[in-house]
């Protein structure tokens, strides 16, 4: 297959970086719940988790893209057979398909809950909206898909980065107090035995887990992009997207640490135990932001749901 977009283009690089960003982030990232469990819960060691994610995520995506560019797979899922052989590769193909399909319906549930919680809409309306938007985008083909989510993803990351920067500029002096609270388990409003949720027993397992579940999502997606784009455009896009996501994670994580015991408006929950911890950060920036933030979360779900199909 002849590659499209062969000439180097910064515009194309930005779109591809946006696609990487968009696929990696989702409702868990936008709400801040993923960042709490995979990074913030480990305090300063969360930076080591981030280093593990950055290295592994960058490594396998560059190699998936390289394989797609050089092998020109008839089907993107053939990348599993390329790496794992006929039998194991076929198993991985079916497993990843089922995994992505089930992940899509998790996204549908998240979209329905988001619009229901913020705007009081019936659950089925949020579900139908996401399914319809996803179907329309997927029907447009790979290039339309990449262009669509490649524009939305960076907007979400920029907003998250802005929340992180504003919060740290205002509350940076509270980071040490937050680190002490995490280390000593002194969380406001915690019941006996209750503590902050984490994704694994230590920062290493957390980092491998965070990059590992994304591997099943990205393998065929990167292989497909590799057949349609020049290596240089795609490599730069992968690097740029990975850096942008990592910067956003670091900023939001330390913003959460500085506000780990900050309560919501009625004091019933705090950043450490909130379902949507970033909403508390956003409301501290500007109270009416919660209504806008629900749209941001929905957009994050959309950008992750589209490539799953």
Predicted feature locations:
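Juxtamembrane interface elements at the cytosolic ends of transmembrane helices
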Residues: 26-36, 60-73, 133, 137, ...
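Membrane-interface loop-to-helix entry segments
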Residues: 111-115, 122-129, 137-171
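Juxtamembrane transmembrane-helix boundary signature
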Residues: 20, 51-77, 259-262
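Hydrophobic, membrane-embedded alpha-helices of multi-pass small-molecule transporters
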Residues: 10-30, 49, 96-100, 104, ...
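Small-residue-rich segments of transmembrane alpha-helices in multi-pass membrane proteins
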Residues: 19, 49-50, 82-93, 153-168, ...
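Transmembrane-helix boundary/entry motifs in multi-pass membrane transporters
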Residues: 3-12, 41-47, 70-100, 117-123, ...
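Extracellular loop-to-transmembrane helix junctions
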Residues: 8-11, 38-63, 240-250
């Amino acid at each position: 297959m002849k590659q499209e977009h062969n000439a180097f283009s910064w515009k194309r690089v930005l779109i591809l970086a946006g696609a990487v960003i968009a696929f990696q982030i989702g409702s868990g990232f936008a709400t801040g719940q993923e960042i709490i469990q995979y990074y913030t819960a480990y305090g300063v060691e969360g930076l080591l988790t981030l280093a593990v994610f950055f290295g592994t995520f960058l490594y396998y995506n560059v190699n998936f893209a390289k394989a797609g560019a050089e092998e020109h797979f008839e089907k993107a899922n053939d990348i599993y057979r390329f790496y794992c052989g006929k039998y194991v590769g076929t198993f991985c193909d079916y497993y990843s398909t089922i995994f992505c399909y089930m992940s899509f319906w998790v996204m549908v549930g998240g979209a329905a809950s988001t619009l229901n919680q913020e705007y009081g809409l019936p659950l089925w309306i949020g579900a139908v909206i996401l399914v319809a938007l996803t179907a329309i985008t997927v029907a447009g083909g790979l290039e339309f898909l990449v262009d669509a989510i490649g524009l939305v993803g960076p907007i979400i990351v920029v907003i998250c980065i802005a929340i992180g920067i504003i919060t740290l500029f205002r509350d940076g002096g509270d980071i040490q107090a937050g680190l002490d609270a995490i280390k000593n388990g002194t969380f406001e409003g915690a019941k006996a035995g209750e503590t902050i949720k984490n994704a694994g027993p230590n920062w290493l397992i957390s980092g491998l887990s965070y990059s590992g579940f994304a591997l099943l999502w990205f393998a065929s997606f990167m292989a497909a992009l590799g057949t349609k784009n020049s290596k240089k455009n795609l490599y730069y896009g992968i690097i740029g997207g990975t850096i942008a996501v990592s910067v956003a994670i670091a900023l939001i994580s330390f913003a959460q640490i500085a506000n780990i015991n900050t309560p919501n408006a009625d004091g019933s929950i705090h950043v450490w135990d909130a379902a949507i911890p970033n909403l508390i950060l956003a409301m501290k920036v500007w109270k009416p932001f919660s209504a806008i933030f629900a749209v941001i979360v929905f957009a994050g779900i959309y950008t992750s749901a589209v490539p799953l199909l």
